[in-house]
Amino acid sequence: DPEMSRGLGDVYKRQEMDICGVFSSVEPLMRYVEPYMSSPLYVPLYTYSPFVSTRPWSRILKGKKVLVIHPFAELIVRQYQRREQLFDNPDVLPEFDLKVIKAVQSLGGESNGFADWFEALQYMKNEMDRTDYDICLIGCGAYGFPLAAHAKRQGKKAIHFGGELQLLFGIKGSRWEDPLHAIKCGLPQDFYQKLFTNPAWVRPEEYKNAHSLKVENACYW
């Protein structure tokens, strides 16, 4: 759809990014898109994950109003209530004022009730504008970057985590059970598997649907 492509181009051409996490194998290719970017600082992608560090960046969330935009919103709220059980280092998930917006998704072709992608994006922007927050953590597919840019334009802070955001709240996913994924991220091959042995971690079974297998072979479940 040419009109859809033009619309997406308009959304994504905004130069709002300050820091960009990349796989080391991809970094040499970034020169092809750099003319369209705002000269962000490149960092290894795994450094976005607070639980890989003994001094996690997420410690600065303490006492803040933190908005999380994710399809598993309700489960994130429940898991946060047991935050002290999820990680050995309490700085990974400190105490803060958690607020959530359930992200709109059309996983594998599931209908979401919106006329098109742009209407769904605007809905989530409106929900953000109605919420009082200091920093926004985002994991909702192709909507993530535009929503993070929207937060920045509103004078807020935002981090587009992508899929790994669920791990911050002790939610397992099959993607991270593959040792090759950890190696690709520059981590020990059993890094995620060790996290998953914690009995406080759960699977998002309640969010499975008929289309889940179409999403990278149900990688988030």
Annotated model-derived regions:
Residues 33-44, 99-123:
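Glycine-rich phosphate-binding "P-loop"
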Residues 25-28, 71-75, 137-146, 162-166:
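Gly/Ser/Thr-rich loops at beta-strand to alpha-helix junctions
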Residues 13-72:
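Extended, H/D-rich, highly charged conserved domains that either
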Residues 1-12:
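Single conserved hydrophobic/aromatic residue that forms the stacking wall/gate
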Residues 146-221:
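C-terminal functional extensions of proteins
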Residues 35-46, 88, 149-164:
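A short, gly/pro- and small-residue-rich
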Residues 69-113:
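Redox- and metal-dependent alpha/beta enzyme cores, enriched for Fe-S-associated oxidoreductases
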Residues 6, 119-132, 143-145:
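A short, acidic, amphipathic alpha-helical segment used as a generic capping/interface helix at domain edges
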